[in-house]
């Protein structure tokens, strides 16, 4: 039986999100956010771009309602448009945190799911050679979509002096932790081919006085001094490797030092984005991955106490334990 009054709200919402995505892609192709870091009329923008003024007005109005552009009315009744703070920081080519256009090409989620249906999970072995410059830069952009921001916002490092960031990769977590906590100094430990990117970012963000880098892995790492915090972000999908890593991390810590464990889990929160994250990760490896309890149990089993949840969002949890 057909109920014609049953509206396809969920379907329409998804299709409308896709429209917003396409609008965002067009605005990036035009480099609008760099051009309107200062207020500009649609007419002036039309002249510089060679694009129809009315089209640009409608585009800017759509971007204004999305929250990426601010409209300012002048005393003469005309409108000027300026990039909103979030667009200036992440979508302007002049920003250090510019996300680039690659993030906004056709996403890999569809390709990933299609490949899983046709071929099953990837059997690729993640060895040290996997961690190329390209992969590290890709993870850097992904981290800027919320991972770094939420970690810096929710992880409390007040009073801590020395942070060890194992597998710190691009280095953004340590760079911005030390920017928030001026007395904190960080040491990033990662593979030799990865730290090329790490050092570039340390220089880019002028963090050389706060962040050091060591080439190597945690198996052979022999620090001369203890740390009072260790940060681990998605460093391993293996339960055995996780326990080994936590055991080693404990030896690197001074008494009452803390380990901060940030990881994807299949039961982070009950929102749609966590469900999407879980689906993607299963399609990538054919394994369900960690649950929250796996992390807290691993922390307790390796001698950490005061195990607490710090933050949960979009398939990720941050938990903390004390030596």
Where are these regions (language model features)?
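A short glycine-rich, Lys/Arg-flanked "PGG" loop and its adjoining helix->strand segment in the class I
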Residues: 243-255
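Conserved SAM-binding loop of SAM-dependent methyltransferases across substrates and taxa
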Residues: 170-182
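N-terminal accessory segments
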Residues: 1-111
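A short SAM/SAH-binding and catalytic strip from SAM-dependent methyltransferases
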Residues: 228-242
